[in-house]
Amino acid sequence: MPAMFTALNGLHHREPGPIPAAVEDPRVTIELINDGFHVQDPMVSLSFRFAPHRTAFVTDAMAATDCPDGAYKLGALDVNVVGGHARLVSNGAIAGSTLLLEVAVRRAVCELGLSPVDAVEAATLTPAKAFGFDKPNPVTGAPIGLIAPGFAADFNLADPADWTVEQVWCAGRKLK
């Protein structure tokens, strides 16, 4: 379910819509933009409660990601970023995000109180499984999503106090 809760009708007892269907179907991966703007924190927590091991963090990040507030383009569309929130100049609609995946994990652990295991799984193994990349495949070669024998050795090491990335490893080599 791409960008769960974003631009979807809310839950209603007579017209439940796609949200309960997605949560109840074990084949569906629930994608969330965990920036506190696209999806509010109680809904993120609810997704982990109702769809554990099927909730994946996504960013929907645009070119303004990790850049200062200001005017940007999203394709041919004019976008204004204020406080890290991207909106179309024409009508004020949300226009993608400026979220970094590491921030989604940090928010999950430090602000929502999710377990580090669940938060990291939502950024790694769950999306890898959704695309079949947790097994050898023609796209990534070695499987991804876990730190285990036979898997690609791509990972970040974070400070356990504040979850800021301290080291970046790719193919088993330290980059940062």
Question: Which stretches of residues belong to each language-model region?
Answer:
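Active-site metal-binding loops of divalent metal-dependent hydrolases
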Residues: 4, 35, 61
